[in-house]
Amino acid sequence: MGILNLWRQFGRRYFWSHLLLGVVAASIGAPTILAGVTDNISQANTSPSQSWQNQALSAFDNLFSLQNVQHQPANGVNYWQQHAVRNVIRQLSFAFSISQPMSDETAKQSIRLSSSNIQQLVLETLNTLLIREPKPPEPVLDIPFLNVASQSSYILTLWIAKAQGIRAGPTAYL
């Protein structure tokens, strides 16, 4: 297999998907949200309790259901934007499901409440990005035109502006 084919496969499998993931993550501020999660991952205990695992799994059922929701194909959202958002949802599902079990119950409760609010906010934002329907711009049809040109003097730019709604061009005649 040639080096060009290997490079093409690497780009298709890894580079472009991670580039899109980074663009979406940077645009919604995920690096600042996940900063505390990565600290918790590095300090995570290797033997968490079974109840903690059950709580973590039940907390992210909503996340997996958001990822698997079928959307209307005609909603006007860019395919690559949907792909990147789904990748972000998938990555966040793993990042949010790993956190450090704590010994103090009050600290554990406060961190769980604050992180669950942030996680829910991020997931709702991503879901909104995924299923939103952008409204197309409405053309302005009723533009008053001054009839300064007579029938004998035909001006192409005024006709194009009047017929096709172009607003650029000479403003003295419009």
From Swiss-Prot:
Residues 1-35 form the signal peptide. NCBIfam families: PRK02943.1-1. It is found in: Cytoplasm, Cytosol; Periplasm. Its main location: cytoplasm. InterPro entries: SecM. One of its GO terms (molecular function) is translation regulator activity. It comes from Photorhabdus laumondii subsp. laumondii (strain DSM 15139 / CIP 105565 / TT01). Coiled coil: none annotated. Regulates secA expression by translational coupling of the secM secA operon. Translational pausing at a specific Pro residue 5 residues before the end of the protein may allow disruption of a mRNA repressor helix that normally suppresses secA translation initiation. It comes from the Bacteria. It holds the Pfam family SecM. Keywords: Cytoplasm, Periplasm, Signal. Belongs to the SecM family. One of its GO terms (cellular component) is periplasmic space. This is Secretion monitor. The gene is secM.
